[in-house]
Amino acid sequence: MKILVVSDSHGSTAFLEQALSRTRDAGIVVHLGDGADDLEALRELTGGKLVYQCNGNMDLYRCNYTDRCIFPADGVTVFACHGHLYDVKSGFLRITLAAKEFNSRICLFGHTHSQFAEDRDGLLLLNPGSIRRGDYAVVYVENGNVRYELKNI
């Protein structure tokens, strides 16, 4: 299972469109907020894929998405959110505890506009960075194994 992970497009769709084009074989697309509705303009590129969109702190009056998404990917539970409600700019304890409540193996978040990935006791914490600057991530889940690539256009 290949997952395209983007965040923080803030109304800019040029790099978002390129990331979608480069990962046409992804089965899941996740937008972690602050521009989650930008995917609507590119619906033809997301057709046939599972799409998860989370509210960010800048989406509160623009979108009707959920604050977090919990979903399966090839038998692995994924916890996805923007991160602002878990104060990720100050640390990862709150978001780690939230993800572990759902027995997640992958925790995706945005908000900081900085790419980050780290394994913490079997939980992958991953921030794709800001797609507005060309940053995104691809996560691969196969037979319970998880790997990722942080990318830039």
Tell where the protein language model's regions lie, with residue ranges.
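Short secondary-structure boundary/capping segments
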Residues: 43, 61, 68-71, 99, ...
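N-terminal active-site segment of His-dependent metallophosphoesterases
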Residues: 1-49, 59-61, 66, 141-152
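Mid-chain, well-packed structural core segment of small domains
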Residues: 74-109
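Glycine-enriched alpha-helix->loop->beta-strand junction motifs that scaffold or abut catalytic
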Residues: 47-51, 122-124
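Active-site neighborhood of phospho(di)ester-bond hydrolases with catalytic His/Asp-centered motifs
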Residues: 5-7, 28-34, 52-57, 79-82, ...
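Helix-adjacent hinge/juxtasegments
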Residues: 50-88
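Active-site environment of divalent metal-dependent phosphoester hydrolases
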Residues: 10-14, 36-40, 58-63, 86-91, ...
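Binuclear metal-dependent phosphoesterase catalytic core
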Residues: 2-3, 17, 70-74, 100-103, ...
